[in-house]
Design a protein with these regions (language model features):
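Basic, alpha-helical interaction scaffolds
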Residues: 1-38, 473-546, 598-601
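Surface-exposed loop/turn segments and immediately adjacent short secondary-structure elements
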Residues: 1-27, 32-33, 104-249, 254, ...
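Short amphipathic alpha-helical coiled-coil/interface segments
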Residues: 30-33, 56-64, 72-87, 91, ...
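Catalytic palm subdomain of template-directed nucleic-acid polymerases
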Residues: 67-68, 203, 322-339, 414-443, ...
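Conserved pre-catalytic core of RNA-dependent polymerases
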Residues: 152, 156, 168-389
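Short, conserved micro-motifs composed of acidic
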Residues: 169, 448-480, 581-588
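Catalytic palm active-site di-aspartate
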Residues: 193, 232-235, 251, 283-285, ...
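Active-site palm subdomain of RNA-directed nucleic acid polymerases
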Residues: 270-283, 386-417, 421
Length: 670
């Protein structure tokens, strides 16, 4: 392939040598890559029932010819027996493959086999038809495509000015090393865009091809002009719920050319760090070393700090309506100019956003291409950074409003991308913050979904507390619990309800995988490893923010024994003790100790980070502790498990190697 590519490139290179047009360079590059790969083996699609045989299909045809029950039933029974036999044989072969890949450390192939057996690749069923604006059902394919084109056009329609020109022409040429790094970071096995070029093809280019790709990228970077094909995206619709018929009940994923993705990875490397420095510490989304864990942890710790000194925490959980699709492109470019992004980078982003088009694909048929006039691009590596800086300028206008004061620092919001929690210490301050955030968000085109935006009071006596926050003429609903970043927050800031919820989610997943996890074909050791990967990981989501008691620790161990008894096919009615179960399976309880170690390691991470999380853990709030026995706090767990006073925990956690030893050793039980 490499030789074929080089030969064709050398033949056509002379024709385009003097050309400075990105379009011609792109057509040459695309033709060369596709020609070199035209005889490459194609990936075969898998059938729905891979165990189905020609013999069974033939028997089914014979069954159709049966004219009465006496003729039909024997044939039907024979087919059922054949299906069971073939399915069992296929199942056993897959189990053997799992064992083989496990022994060879082929984890990717092992997980692929597990998904085949458990049916995790199944998509939600759809009717194939959708409703128009008036709610009338559309059945014809042309009508469905036309409706999708209309929906996309209306969703992304905006009145924007002509293409802006950057205030400077700064920006160094793109280096070959940058392109090589971007290609190396690109994942394999991803669907191509309209050009048909896959990541596997681009990874085969090697030095000669990468030189040509770098030339193309520098032409685009210097002029800001993109080849037309690179600006075309294809949207694939996925239903949010089974049998969805309304366009708004679908989510779309975007297929774009991988060549463009690599180019944008280069741009990301240039502007990503600059944007991240400008984003405030209360934004946890799309940032290195940060995620939902940090957002959940920070909110829970702040809530506990308020309860320690008998103060209430007033919260408004904001839900924006399609926030990523409502970004105004003109304001986005202005944000980039304000933080000093190079002119060439701004020009590239502006041209990309002003000239992009998209079409919807329904069963291999495309709707007409539509201009996308607002919103950040779906599936683009730049979008998270651009959205973060866009919303940062909204909240900069609100930072001076009073929220909570912890360790001398005013905090009135916690964010993960568009998931926002506004926090204050009283109703009046919360009303001011909500009003200001709504006002600034509206200026930027983002609208609150009033029906889904909720308020809550974290308090020692929540039943006596009421809060009325207005958005326009509507009063926001006050709730007793709220799912924030996938974890359930309650008005008493306890972990018991969240742990019960995680247990139920994990049990539901276990029941879906029960056929595999209770199979006698797999070794117990393999099943335990699968349980740890698929079941325990679901259960432990957000466990770093849990505050545990002796009762909750007992519930965690009971859930672990439930899983172990199931995979060992041991019933409760067998009256076998937990210790005997562990001996029979030749294993030990590990779930609780793993959670404890994760919490301790996370405390060390927080202590050494010296950021808002450190402030939340170590900071003090004004106020006095109430009378009576104090509640267990997050730090209570750390002190009791390590048998160290708070001051020793603080000093020793600052030493990574020392704290690592403490987190690994057997921990003190309550």
């Amino acid at each position: 392939m490499k030789n074929k590519y080089e030969l064709l490139s050398l033949e056509t290179d002379e024709q385009c040598q003097e050309s400075s047009e990105p379009e011609k360079k792109w057509q040459q590059l695309k033709e060369s890559i596709n020609y070199a790969n035209e005889n490459a083996p194609k990936i075969e699609r898998k059938t729905k029932k891979v165990w189905m045989t020609e013999e069974i299909l033939t028997k089914m045809e014979e069954r159709k010819k049966a004219k009465n029950t006496s003729a039909y039933e024997p044939k039907n029974k024979e087919i059922q027996n054949l299906c069971k036999k073939e399915k069992d044989a296929w199942y056993n072969n897959k189990c053997d493959e799992i064992e083989k890949y496990l022994n060879l450390n082929g984890t990717k192939k092992m997980h692929s086999c597990i998904k085949e057996l458990t049916g995790d690749n199944k998509s939600k069923p759809t009717t194939g038809c959708i409703k128009d604006k008036e709610g009338k059902m559309l059945f014809e394919r042309d009508q469905v495509l036309e409706r999708w084109a209309e929906y996309v056009s209306e969703l992304f329609a905006d009145e924007r000015p002509s293409l802006p020109e950057p205030s400077n022409d700064r920006g160094p040429p793109i280096l070959k090393s940058e392109v090589e790094k971007a290609i190396k970071m690109t994942q394999l096995g991803k669907a191509p865009g309209e050009d048909g070029i896959t990541t596997e093809m681009l990874k085969l280019l090697e030095d000669f091809g990468i030189d040509k790709l770098t030339e193309l990228f520098n032409l685009i970077y210097a002029s800001g002009q993109f080849p037309e094909e690179l600006l075309m995206s294809i949207y694939i619709t996925l239903p949010k719920q089974p049998r969805a018929t309304d366009c708004s009940n679908f989510r779309t994923i975007s297929l774009m050319p991988h060549t463009l993705k690599i180019f944008l990875k280069v741009i990301q490397g240039r502007i990503g760090t600059k944007i991240d420095k400008e984003v405030g510490p209360t934004q946890f989304g799309f940032r290195p070393g940060s995620g939902t864990r940090e957002g959940i942890f920070c909110y829970n710790i702040i809530a506990q700090k308020h309860l320690e000194v008998d103060k209430d925490l007033y919260t408004c959980f904001i839900d924006y309506s399609k926030a990523f699709d409502k970004v105004h492109h003109e304001q986005l470019i202005q944000c980039l100019e304000k933080i000093g992004v190079d002119g060439r980078d701004i020009r590239v982003i502006a041209n990309l956003y002003w000239h992009q088009k998209a079409a919807i694909r329904i069963q291999n048929q495309l709707s007409p291409f539509t201009s996308i006039q607002r919103g950040v691009r779906q599936g683009c590596v730049l979008s998270p950074y651009l959205f973060n800086i866009y919303t940062e300028f909204i909240f900069r206008e609100c930072n001076e409003l009073q929220g909570i004061n912890i360790h001398g620092q005013n905090i009135n919001n916690l964010r993960y991308a568009d998931d926002t929690a506004l926090i204050t210490d009283n109703q009046e301050n919360l009303q001011r913050v909500v009003t200001k955030v709504r006002e600034e968000s509206s200026k930027a085109g983002l609208e609150m979904n009033v029906k889904k935006t909720k308020t809550m009071i974290i308090s020692r006596k929540p039943e006596d507390k009421k809060v009325e926050i207005k958005v326009g003429d509507e009063i926001l609903q006050q709730v007793h619990k709220y799912i924030y970043l996938g974890t359930e927050i309650t008005e008493e800031a306890r972990s018991d309800i969240e742990i019960e919820k995680r247990k139920n989610i994990a049990k539901e997943k276990f029941s879906k995988m029960a056929g595999l996890l209770t199979s006698r074909k797999l070794k117990i050791k393999t099943k335990i490893r699968i349980v740890k990967c698929y079941i325990y990981s679901l259960f432990c989501y957000g466990c770093e923010s849990w505050t545990l008691s002796k009762v909750l620790e007992g519930k965690i161990e009971a859930f672990e024994m439930f899983c172990l008894r199931k995979i060992g096919n041991i019933k409760w009615s067998d009256k076998i003790t937990n210790e005997r179960v562990l001996q029979k399976l030749q294993t030990k309880r590990t779930l609780l100790s793993d959670i404890q170690k994760r919490k301790l390691r996370y405390y060390g991470h927080v202590k050494r980070s010296n950021n808002i999380l450190t402030t939340a853990v170590e900071g003090k709030l004004e106020g006095k502790r109430p009378r009576g026995r104090p509640r267990n706090t997050w730090m209570t767990d750390v002190r009791e498990w390590t048998s160290l006073p708070a001051s020793a925990c603080t000093s020793q956690a600052a030493d990574r190697s020392l704290w690592s030893v403490i987190a690994r050793r057997p921990l003190q039980r309550r």
